[in-house]
Amino acid sequence: DEVLIIGVNGTTLNNNGEVTDPECKAYYVSKKNNFIPKHVEELDTSLVLLKQDNISRLYQILDNLNLTEEEIEAIKANTENELEAKIKAIHQRLYDDKSLKKTLNTNDKLYVFTGLIMAGLATNGVKRLEVSDLSSNNSEALNDGAIVLDHIKVFLTARHATTDKIYLITSLLGNVFKNKTMWQPLNGESLIKRLFAQISQDIIPLLESNLHLDFTGKILNSLSDWVSIDNDKANDVVLTPSYVTHFMARLAKTNKDSFVWDLAMGSGGFLVSAMDIMIKDAENKIQDKDELEAKIINIKENQLLGVEILGNIYILGVLNMILMGDGSTHMYRDDSHNLYTQLGKKFPATVFLLNPPYSAEGKGFIFVQEALSQMTEGYAAILIQENAGSGNGLPYTKNILKDNTLVASIRMPNDLFSGKASVQTAIYVFKVAEPHDKDNLVTFIDMSEDGYTRQNRKKSSQEVNLRNTDHAKERYAE
């Protein structure tokens, strides 16, 4: 997982055969730094740190060589762009295959991606599925689809998924992998095997990192660039950009001890951002290695909760949290309106993050009222239609303010969703369990010009469709 690379160079030898102009550079490459070389300046002028007596000092130096926040953000951006390009290339292949146009709808494509990714990921105690394991048998009982489904079950079991969750996920994936067109060999090779070969080569290496990204949100967005996700208009499937989910998690004062929930989680983008902030806070505040490891496990297993009613989107949320390694313990496929009181009794939420379906009652404020009614402390950050706060959210907004304080209202750009939805939104920030007094000061901020220039070109990358043209990162940080 780590290596020290030392290069020595020189051009001139003296009469004793010694290099008179030596140059030395050393770089530390490690998994913790996503294999980005970090310069070890202390070894440039002397290699004395390599002596056995000094090795502890060298280890201390290497332990402190970490990526800067700027380097991490650059890696994240590059990874997202590369992932998006690879996904679109695979989807273009599916889109251009005339034989598949009537075989795979958009939901099926989501299931193909998520299923093959689950099958191809490594996990402790289970050998990852290799392309060579798929034999393209022309058999109803033993074919590539059956092999993939079996491997998914083993993978989920190894990740300690409950029996109910395994059954739900394999049921959702079953139809597409049991489809004869998918597993029947053509020229000696099944479509499943061809797609898995490309996903294994192009997609999975990008997912097996310690970056906290909304990976499956990127998959969903890439597919919805081409065709609408089934039911997305009825259920308002619009994913919140990652820079906004991170911004909102910070507005809600998320930290290592927060308990974060989202009752309309989509692909889990808010929970991914919250987890990232929580883990970084733990790393900054906990010195003991064993205590830190235990805290990170607790964050992933006990301090995050999400609910999603749509099966095709829920499975993306579960995969996202598995890729985070593994925060899927408290992910529920259900109607949160039926579940929130039951969950509220078991989960001591202190942070509520939400981008609700705006077609719901009160423009989505019904979700807010239900969630905040179960909380006794903390903060909530809600991305919602701006007019919901000026009458269209009644009676829910009035009820919310009886028990909670509106701290801030932040007007967001009307093209926030880059062409996928054109609606004027605002972020409302609440302090929970403190009734709003009419004399309370509310902070109003206009972020409608946030520094990003957006467009929605189907075949363009995020670099093209979202450009920082006027200090956008600094504005959100401020």
Q: Model-derived features: where do they sit?
A:
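A conserved structural/catalytic subdomain of Rossmann-like adenosyl-cofactor enzymes
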Residues: 36-38, 333, 345-478
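Non-catalytic protein-protein interaction scaffold segments in large eukaryotic complex-forming proteins
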Residues: 58-94
